């Protein structure tokens, strides 16, 4: 009986210790509200959660999903999120309206923001109208006055406007119907519009339906990054937390660089979680079409010690473009051109955090 009591006492002590450990662990893990869209850059935090990397860094990533970049920016004042991924275009408005930081680069989406047309479109009859952009389809005559379905103030909008510019046209020369990417696909499939602007992975839905690429950001002479964005107030008050978030993200980037298309099965699972169905072959293509950059590469890209950094130059091109379009007021454009919202201070902290 005495031995039994000892065992009961021992078991109770063990249970108490385990409970204390669990309580301590729970106290160490902090819910982190993050913002994303159903696309490539979001695979990293999703994969991190599957692997438990967020917990190892002291976080529980809460992934808040949005249909567009501007919807993400509009949710920032309510503090629905404090860090996450968005396009380089909505990033400008996040900086202007909410004083948000650009804290890192998620990927390069230059070839996955595209203008698509139906296979029988007269737009496809002309290729290389502008000799500077030989792979771009269309002509002023075949495009002017047409209706284009697009998500305005987005990376896709940039793709569309670059296409028009390559043809000597502007947004004013066409009719733009603003809707989110999924709505764009549904409407274009019903016969609405003459062209549709999509980014991955919705772009692949269009390609599966037989639609053809008339132009993308790269063929029209541009570059568009997906960036990691941070709420300024949160970032300034919690620099080490931001660095730990970035460390987890770079853990994912390193996996993408080392594993590449081997991650296609997991990537397809991620897309299904996000509400999109994609085959493993399509998943491989999406992985291949999204270059990512390591921490060391990004430290160089953000380095402005000898003048304008690469990231500042990329964002400056976007600012100039949207100022010329009239989407940014001249004073807003001048403010953004200084690059005040682009910072590498959190990147530099990444090697110092555990």
Predicted regions span which residues?
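Bacterial N-terminal signal peptides that target proteins for export
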Residues: 1-11
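Sec/Tat signal peptide C-region and signal peptidase I cleavage site
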Residues: 18-26
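Short, glycine-/small- and polar/acidic-enriched structural segments
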Residues: 27-171, 175-178, 194-200, 216, ...
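Surface-exposed patches in mature extracellular/periplasmic domains of secreted proteins
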Residues: 63, 102-103, 176, 256-267, ...
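Pocket-lining segment of extracytoplasmic ligand-binding domains
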Residues: 183-273
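Secondary-structure end/capping motifs
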Residues: 237-327
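Conserved C-terminal helix/tail region of periplasmic/extracytoplasmic solute-binding proteins
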Residues: 312-354
